[in-house]
């Protein structure tokens, strides 16, 4: 049975809650001792992982809609992408304000250039910014065929963001490896699409 438009609306409500509730938890953890002895790193990793989760969820929508024969699921993709950008922005902000500090923001540019994993992170964020700014129907009409070409660049983020995570951890743990593996699996589902590009 296919999902109805009303069911998709309720699904969107649930997805908005999924995007907002982690923020409430983070505020609670900050104010009630729910973080470790290095709360700055905890906040950075939490916001980054949440952004990655929404990125993976965004990439999951198309194959899930196709294989489950639920075309209306596509309507949730933009919402998931926007939450991915929100959490990626919180991740970047947590680094700029908590790691560097508001008085050292002038160092941000040099830090992004001198540390390769940060370079990958800011490239990913800039791509997400471009996709967010052009995610409206107005932008889609204005850009025409170029809109899809631009939004295919999300696959670059699917490569760079997990590498950014893997590179940023001092001790390799299963978690970043799992995220990288999931991203590769979701890209592999698009093998035919990529193959057509290279013909």
Curated annotation (Swiss-Prot):
<feature type="transmembrane region" description="Helical">
    <location>
        <begin position="82"/>
        <end position="102"/>
    </location>
</feature>
<dbReference type="GO" id="GO:0005886">
    <property type="term" value="C:plasma membrane"/>
</dbReference>
<dbReference type="GO" id="GO:0010181">
    <property type="term" value="F:FMN binding"/>
</dbReference>
<keyword id="KW-0479">Metal-binding</keyword>
<keyword id="KW-1003">Cell membrane</keyword>
<feature type="transmembrane region" description="Helical">
    <location>
        <begin position="10"/>
        <end position="30"/>
    </location>
</feature>
<keyword id="KW-0472">Membrane</keyword>
<dbReference type="GO" id="GO:0020037">
    <property type="term" value="F:heme binding"/>
</dbReference>
<comment type="subunit">
    <text>Heterodimer of a catalytic subunit (MsrP) and a heme-binding subunit (MsrQ).</text>
</comment>
<keyword id="KW-0285">Flavoprotein</keyword>
<keyword id="KW-0288">FMN</keyword>
<feature type="transmembrane region" description="Helical">
    <location>
        <begin position="153"/>
        <end position="173"/>
    </location>
</feature>
<dbReference type="InterPro" id="IPR013130">
    <property type="entry name" value="Fe3_Rdtase_TM_dom"/>
</dbReference>
<comment type="function">
    <text>Part of the MsrPQ system that repairs oxidized periplasmic proteins containing methionine sulfoxide residues (Met-O), using respiratory chain electrons. Thus protects these proteins from oxidative-stress damage caused by reactive species of oxygen and chlorine generated by the host defense mechanisms. MsrPQ is essential for the maintenance of envelope integrity under bleach stress, rescuing a wide series of structurally unrelated periplasmic proteins from methionine oxidation, including the primary periplasmic chaperone SurA and the lipoprotein Pal.</text>
</comment>
<keyword id="KW-0813">Transport</keyword>
<keyword id="KW-0408">Iron</keyword>
<keyword id="KW-0249">Electron transport</keyword>
<dbReference type="InterPro" id="IPR022837">
    <property type="entry name" value="MsrQ-like"/>
</dbReference>
<comment type="similarity">
    <text>Belongs to the MsrQ family.</text>
</comment>
<keyword id="KW-0997">Cell inner membrane</keyword>
<feature type="transmembrane region" description="Helical">
    <location>
        <begin position="116"/>
        <end position="136"/>
    </location>
</feature>
<protein>
    <recommendedName>
        <fullName>Protein-methionine-sulfoxide reductase heme-binding subunit MsrQ</fullName>
    </recommendedName>
</protein>
<dbReference type="GO" id="GO:0046872">
    <property type="term" value="F:metal ion binding"/>
</dbReference>
<keyword id="KW-0349">Heme</keyword>
<dbReference type="GO" id="GO:0016679">
    <property type="term" value="F:oxidoreductase activity, acting on diphenols and related substances as donors"/>
</dbReference>
<dbReference type="GO" id="GO:0009055">
    <property type="term" value="F:electron transfer activity"/>
</dbReference>
<dbReference type="GO" id="GO:0030091">
    <property type="term" value="P:protein repair"/>
</dbReference>
<dbReference type="Pfam" id="PF01794">
    <property type="entry name" value="Ferric_reduct"/>
</dbReference>
<keyword id="KW-1133">Transmembrane helix</keyword>
<keyword id="KW-0812">Transmembrane</keyword>
């Amino acid at each position: 049975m296919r999902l109805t438009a009303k069911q998709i609306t309720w699904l969107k409500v649930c997805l908005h809650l999924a995007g907002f509730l982690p923020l409430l938890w983070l505020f609670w953890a900050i104010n009630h001792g729910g973080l470790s002895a290095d709360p700055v790193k905890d906040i950075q990793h939490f916001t980054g992982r949440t952004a990655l989760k929404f990125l993976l969820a965004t990439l999951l929508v198309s194959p899930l809609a196709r294989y489950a024969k639920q075309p209306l699921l596509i309507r949730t993709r933009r919402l998931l992408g926007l939450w991915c950008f929100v959490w990626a922005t919180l991740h970047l902000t947590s680094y700029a304000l908590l790691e560097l500090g508001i008085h050292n923001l002038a160092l941000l540019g040099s830090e992004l250039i001198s540390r390769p994993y940060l370079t990958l992170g800011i490239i990913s964020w800039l791509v997400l910014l471009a996709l967010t700014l052009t995610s409206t129907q107005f932008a889609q009409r204005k850009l025409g065929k170029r809109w899809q070409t631009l939004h295919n660049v999300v696959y670059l983020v699917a490569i760079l963001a997990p590498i950014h995570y893997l590179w940023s951890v001092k001790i390799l743990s299963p978690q970043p490896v799992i995220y990288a593996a999931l991203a590769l699996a979701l890209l592999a589902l698009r093998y035919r699409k990529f193959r057509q590009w290279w013909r």
